[in-house]
Amino acid sequence: MPLAEGSTFAGFTIVRQLGSGGMGEVYLARHPRLPRQDALKVLRADVSADGEYRARFNREADAAASLWHPHIVAVHDRGEFDGQLWIDMDFVDGTDTVSLLRDRYPNGMPGPEVTEIITAVAEALDYAHERRLLHRDVKPANILIANPDSPDRRIMLADFGIAGWVDDPSGLTATNMTVGTVSYAAPEQLMGNELDGRADQYALAATAFHLLTGSPPFQHANPAVVISQHLSASPPAIGDRVPELTPLDPVFAKALAKQPKDRYQRCVDFARALGHRLGGAGDPDDTRVSQPVAVAAPAKRSLLRTAVIVPAVLAMLLVMAVAVAVREFQRADDERAAQPARTRTTTSAGTTTSVAPASTTRPAPTTPTTTGAADTATASPTAAVVAIGALCFPLGSTGTTKTGATAYCSTLQGTNTTIWSLTEDTVASPTVTATADPTEAPLPIEQESPIRVCMQQTGQTRRECREEIRRSNGWP
């Protein structure tokens, strides 16, 4: 239950609630001894009772408290009161970049303003990296701006709440993995691999992409699709979203590279390249190679860690994906049923499914359906309805096809792409041949191969497979 205004908690007097989330609430509170107001984050009792999380929370709060930088929200104290962990931080009286986008720049912020914000955050991140600390959750919601309409406004990076040491084997877990994080997380972070400062650089680049265009690089109502795109899809060209930003295409191609070694070594290198191409203050030689931030060699990857973290994180996301998949196939069945009646017209209202911070609008099913857990029950008590050849995540998960057959999330041979298949483990390259529709432009191999897998395994036509995969993946 949220704390009431005027009540006391650990000596702090609650002024008002600032926000809430899955792990707890944040309050504006008066300090018990000093004449100031702070931001007090209070975790839920059930989260606080988790022994492993408690130890990690204390360790990471201590790590965040060691940072002292003009662009980092300071951590002052931590503790426990009535079975709930809490952390005391600076209160930033202002806004965040999510609010700026929503209220002022729904189609993207001006280049010079983005350069200023990204440069400030990049300096803060490199400062932390030099001290062997990673943020792990860089996104627009964590970039705060104090006095946003003043010439002396301050740009600050908040919530080192899942910060950790470079060689810390914890960090990304189901407890702190959110849909918002998925939109900006680096491939190696999503896979539970070793991390260094280049994971934060990837997230910073995804954040810059969002600030400039009004939406993140990869967006889909199904978070499992977003994850698959981070892992296997080519970085989107920002010029395709905003033509006047075409000069930034090579900058984002490098910053959003799948392999850390192909990215900028430091966050400020990315910020300089961005500023130079936008015509602001930046590095005139944005191709030069800088020395990477010096950190201790990370610990060897733990197979147990990967085996536990990745399924735990993405099982949560798969639950959210179930409802989307069910609605898509219900809509597909209705469309097929309507095709023989050429004069029949169906009108339905639009529904919006949000993946923070962007949204995707889709037609509603023509047959009334319920949402949430009820959608899951519509397909099967334990599995989602899936399309053979469609993107899936996590590897090894199972689903049910529209015919009732069991489908497996498997790797397509010779790629890092995971698709639904009637066979387990690796999906062999399809041997079936298909004549392309003469009215259709040739598809890239990463889209063509899954279609042929579908044809080979289900016996459906190329058009049927293409349409089912297109709907499931959200392709145009």
Curated annotation (Swiss-Prot):
Active site per database record: D137
Subcellular location: Cell membrane
Phosphothreonine: residues carrying this PTM: T8, T13, T173, T175, T287
Gene3D superfamilies with a match to the protein in the record: Phosphorylase Kinase, domain 1, Transferase(Phosphotransferase) domain 1
Post-translational modification remark: Autophosphorylated. Dephosphorylated by PstP.
Molecular function, one GO term: protein serine/threonine kinase activity
Residues the record lists as Phosphoserine modifications: S290
A GO CC annotation given for this chain: plasma membrane
Membrane-protein topology: Single-pass membrane protein
PROSITE patterns given in the database record: PROTEIN_KINASE_DOM, PROTEIN_KINASE_ST
Record's catalysed reaction(s): L-seryl-[protein] + ATP = O-phospho-L-seryl-[protein] + ADP + H(+); L-threonyl-[protein] + ATP = O-phospho-L-threonyl-[protein] + ADP + H(+)
Swiss-Prot/TrEMBL keywords: ATP-binding, Cell membrane, Kinase, Membrane, Nucleotide-binding, Phosphoprotein, Serine/threonine-protein kinase, Transferase, Transmembrane, Transmembrane helix
Family matches, as InterPro entries: Kinase-like_dom_sf, Prot_kinase_dom, Ser/Thr_kinase_AS
Domain Protein kinase span(s) in chain numbering: 12-279
Domain of life: Bacteria
Gene disruption phenotype: Disruption does not attenuate growth in macrophages.
Subunit structure: Interacts with Rv1747.
Family: Belongs to the protein kinase superfamily. Ser/Thr protein kinase family.
Record-given protein name: Serine/threonine-protein kinase PknF
Protein species of origin: Mycobacterium tuberculosis (strain ATCC 25618 / H37Rv)
Organism classification: Bacteria, Bacillati, Actinomycetota, Actinomycetes, Mycobacteriales
Gene: pknF
